């Protein structure tokens, strides 16, 4: 897809194994006439959050990107780096 991303949906996560799939699916089901991307800031969860997010990113590489690091950076830095990775004209936060 070469058209510009209009909306970047920012999701920051830490140990959200129970909720992450539902949150991602809620964005993927949106019907729009513009391009949406999901940018997930995964902050070294100790559960399966990262694995679930990576599975979705593999299934939808044109729509989902994951921002990670080798160590937990905390919620504030996680938000900043995830927003910085956004390509959209507009940003939506999904907590």
Where are these regions (language model features)?
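Cell-envelope/extracellular polymer assembly enzymes that use nucleotide-activated donors
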Residues: 6-8, 37
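Short, well-formed alpha-helical segments that are part of the catalytic scaffolds
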Residues: 16-29
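Conserved short acidic donor-positioning loop in nucleotide-sugar-dependent glycosyltransferases
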Residues: 27, 43-44, 73
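A conserved acidic beta->alpha catalytic loop
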Residues: 42-51
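Active-site acidic Asp-centered loop
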Residues: 43, 94-95
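Glycine-rich, basic loop-to-helix element that forms the pyrophosphate-binding segment
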Residues: 69-86
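Short aromatic/hydrophobic "clamp" motif used to bind/position activated sugar donors
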Residues: 91
């Amino acid at each position: 897809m070469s058209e510009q991303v209009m909306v970047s949906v920012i999701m920051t996560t830490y140990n959200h194994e129970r909720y992450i799939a539902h949150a991602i699916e809620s964005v993927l089901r949106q019907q729009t006439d513009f391009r949406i991307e999901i940018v997930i800031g995964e902050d070294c969860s100790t559960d399966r959050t990262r694995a679930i997010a990576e599975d979705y990113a593999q299934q939808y590489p044109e729509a989902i990107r994951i921002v990670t690091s080798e160590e937990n950076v905390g919620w504030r830095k996680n938000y900043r780096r995830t927003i910085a990775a956004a390509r959209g004209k507009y940003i939506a936060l999904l907590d």
